[in-house]
């Protein structure tokens, strides 16, 4: 590298010498410069000897100091980092005394030195080349080379063919958990909150009151905001209140009165038949059994009865045993036999003499006599050998 740079510097000096010879003024010439620089202030080859090319070249100048000059006279050839010597052609003189007839420079002397010096002496002599010969094309800077080889990092196993087996397993488990969560959410759906209109998910978020569903956070006291789930509350004017606010905030003035005892209902209220009751006051008028949560019925006078006492009081009486005809156990339909405008139990409808069970079948028909239920044979025996009457018509109601 040092030899090639020295040869390039010598060639540059030779071309500079030729330029100086052409630029010498003649007798009739005012001393104008044809090409290249007008004069050379300094030219110091690296070795301090004559340049190649023989006659016409500049003589060797004394050794320049190791510290190169700065400013417009700086050398065009870059200095070598391993040598204390410097060489090159100074362009500062022509640029200080005006441009020559040659091609104009693209920038200042300092910028030209820095740009050409990095490319060597051949680039510095672009203005000294013969006509028709252009400078070498500029090269882009090569990427920096690392002095040591970079280590190659191995790829994780399975990356060339997509995700690894562990990643696929993790993705499958994630999808399975999402499906399980969606299924659980669907199972825990209770309905729509009547207050906010949103869905209710989870047993802890559901609250049922007054025949409607609420969110636990939606069913609260309108006065203090306390949650009323599992607590006593009072409904006043389509608003609900906790027990404390209802009792100590003047709401007792609007409290309902029990239809039985006439007292204010300050605790739980039971509403039936358009009236309000204490739970303990809603009882059967016959047996006095509490009917809270128990089926009941009423008569024409709105008297309350349990089902058993209602049938006992209002059910038809059997003409044979004088007991009421009630529905069978577990059945709501009353079955009775009507004969001679009288009601009978099915088991009480039999012959009074022989006990034969009477019905509408042949041989079991009823032949009444003087208000008595008799079969055909017993009827003839009571009449002797007299003519037989026609069998009595009986009706069985189901």
Curated annotation (Swiss-Prot):
The keyword Transferase does not apply. The keyword Repeat applies. Belongs to the zyxin/ajuba family. One of its GO terms (molecular function) is transcription corepressor activity. Residues 16-166 are annotated as: Disordered. It comes from the Eukaryota. This is Wilms tumor protein 1-interacting protein. Residues 132-157 have a biased composition (Pro residues). CDD domains: LIM1_Ajuba_like (cd09352), LIM2_Ajuba_like (cd09355), LIM3_Ajuba_like (cd09438). Residues 191-252, 256-315, 316-385 form the LIM zinc-binding domain. One of its GO terms (biological process) is regulation of cell morphogenesis. Residues 74-90, 106-124 have a biased composition (Low complexity). Expressed in kidney, lung, eye and ovary. In kidney, restricted to podocytes. Adapter or scaffold protein which participates in the assembly of numerous protein complexes and is involved in several cellular processes such as cell fate determination, cytoskeletal organization, repression of gene transcription, cell-cell adhesion, cell differentiation, proliferation and migration. Positively regulates microRNA (miRNA)-mediated gene silencing. Negatively regulates Hippo signaling pathway and antagonizes phosphorylation of YAP1. Acts as a transcriptional corepressor for SNAI1 and SNAI2/SLUG-dependent repression of E-cadherin transcription. Keywords: Cell junction, Cell membrane, Cilium biogenesis/degradation, Cytoplasm, LIM domain, Membrane, Metal-binding, Nucleus, Repeat, Repressor, RNA-mediated gene silencing, Transcription, Transcription regulation, Zinc. It is found in: Cell junction, Focal adhesion; Cell junction, Adherens junction; Nucleus; Cytoplasm, Cytosol. Gene3D superfamilies: Cysteine Rich Protein. One of its GO terms (cellular component) is plasma membrane. InterPro entries: Ajuba-like, Ajuba-like_LIM1, Ajuba-like_LIM2, Ajuba-like_LIM3, Znf_LIM. Forms homodimers. Interacts with EIF4E, AGO1, AGO2, DCP2, DDX6, LATS1, LATS2, SAV1, EGLN2/PHD1 and EGLN3/PHD3. Interacts (via LIM domains) with VHL. Interacts with CD2AP and WT1. Interacts (via LIM domains) with SNAI1 (via SNAG domain), SNAI2/SLUG (via SNAG domain) and SCRT1 (via SNAG domain). Interacts with ROR2. Following treatment with bacterial lipopolysaccharide (LPS), forms a complex with MAPK8IP3 and dynein intermediate chain. Interacts with PRICKLE3.
């Amino acid at each position: 590298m040092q030899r090639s740079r020295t040869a390039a510097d010598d060639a540059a000096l030779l071309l500079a010498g030729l330029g100086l010879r052409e630029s010498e003024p003649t007798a009739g010439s005012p001393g104008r410069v044809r090409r290249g620089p007008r004069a050379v202030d300094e030219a110091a080859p690296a070795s301090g000897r004559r340049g190649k090319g023989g006659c016409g070249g500049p003589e060797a100048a004394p050794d320049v100091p190791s510290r190169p000059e700065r400013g417009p006279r700086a050398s065009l050839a870059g200095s070598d980092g391993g040598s204390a010597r410097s060489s090159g052609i100074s362009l500062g003189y022509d640029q200080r005394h005006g441009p020559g007839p040659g091609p104009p420079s693209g920038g200042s002397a300092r910028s030209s030195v820095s740009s050409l010096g990095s490319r060597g002496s051949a680039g510095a002599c672009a203005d000294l080349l013969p006509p028709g010969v252009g400078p070498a094309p500029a090269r882009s800077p090569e990427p920096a080379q690392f002095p040591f080889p970079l280590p190659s990092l191995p790829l994780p196993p399975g990356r060339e063919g997509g995700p690894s087996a562990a990643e696929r397993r993790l993705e499958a488990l994630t999808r399975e958990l999402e499906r399980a969560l969606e299924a659980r959410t669907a199972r825990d759906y209770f309905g729509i909150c009547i207050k906010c209109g949103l869905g209710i998910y989870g047993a802890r978020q559901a609250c049922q009151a007054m025949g409607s569903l609420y969110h636990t956070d939606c069913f609260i006291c309108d006065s203090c905001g306390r949650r009323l789930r599992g607590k006593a509350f009072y409904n006043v004017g389509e608003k609900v209140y906790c027990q404390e606010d209802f009792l100590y905030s003047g709401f007792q003035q609007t409290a309902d009165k029990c239809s039985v005892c006439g007292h204010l209902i300050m605790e739980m209220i039971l509403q039936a038949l358009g009236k309000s009751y204490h739970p303990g006051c809603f009882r059967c008028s016959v047996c006095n059994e509490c009917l809270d949560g128990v089926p009941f019925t009423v008569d024409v006078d709105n008297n309350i009865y349990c089902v058993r006492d209602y049938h006992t009081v209002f059910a038809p009486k059997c003409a044979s045993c004088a007991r009421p005809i009630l529905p069978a156990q577990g059945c709501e339909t009353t079955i009775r036999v009507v004969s001679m405008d009288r009601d009978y139990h099915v088991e009480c409808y039999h012959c009074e003499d022989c006990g034969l069970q009477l019905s509408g079948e042949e041989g079991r028909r009823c032949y009444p006599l003087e208000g008595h239920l008799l079969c055909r044979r017993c009827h003839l025996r009571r009449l002797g050998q007299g003519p037989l009457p026609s069998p009595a018509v009986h009706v069985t109601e189901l």
